[in-house]
């Protein structure tokens, strides 16, 4: 199977170079707004590619404010293998470090209903974080079921199912260097 046939049902929405430019711009904004001793909480699995690029962009952008983030991961599940939200969020794997008294930046792939990020934010708040901000690569407007917004947004996208750059459909397509859309049933 060639790469072209493997991806015949994926339409490119945002190219790799557009993503790179936007991640750099986001990092430049983030370093002016947040303290250098950040705790980054990356929500797995969808945000691992975005987080990996964002922390390096933060390093490059943060020469002046001396940013030195710590990174931790939490696996939350709300979708399972389907493309429709099950409505409840569960911790599949928890953080390894305490967030008490820390300035936390939660990083996620996409803000849709807002259930995942509401759950993560409330949990981290309950655990005594000093401050909490949210950065998402993508957001879909008009889909929110919870009153939550991200402080830093990469791209606002139409109401289609996005894959690539860490985002999946049935745990496939995460490796794509661009963001594409697929038809889901
Ligand atoms: P929310 O809880 O509905 O805001 O959805 C957040 C989670 O659902 C994200 O972290 C993704 O894992 C998943 N999700 C929502 N929309 C998409 C999409 O278009 N493509 C891939 N995953 C998505
Ligand atoms: Mg996710």
Where are these regions (language model features)?
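PRPP-associated nucleotide enzymes
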Residues: 1-185
């Amino acid at each position: 199977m060639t790469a072209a046939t493997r991806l015949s049902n994926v339409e490119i929405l945002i190219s790799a170079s557009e993503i790179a430019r936007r991640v750099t711009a986001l990092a430049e904004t983030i370093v002016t707004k947040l303290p250098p001793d950040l705790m980054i909480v990356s929500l797995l699995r969808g945000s691992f590619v975005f987080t990996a690029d964002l922390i390096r962009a933060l390093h490059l952008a943060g020469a002046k404010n001396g940013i030195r983030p710590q990174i931790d991961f939490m696996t939350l599940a709300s979708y399972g293998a389907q493309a429709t939200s099950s409505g409840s969020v569960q911790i599949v794997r928890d953080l390894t470090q305490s967030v008490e008294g820390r300035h936390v930046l939660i990083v996620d792939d996409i803000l849709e209903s807002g259930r995942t990020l509401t759950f993560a934010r409330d949990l981290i708040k309950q655990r005594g974080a000093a401050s909490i901000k949210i950065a998402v690569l993508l957001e879909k407007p008009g889909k929110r079921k919870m009153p939550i917004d991200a402080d830093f947004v990469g791209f606002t996208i139409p109401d289609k199912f996005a894959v690539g750059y860490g985002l999946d459909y049935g745990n496939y397509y995460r490796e794509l260097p661009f963001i594409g859309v697929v038809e889901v049933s």
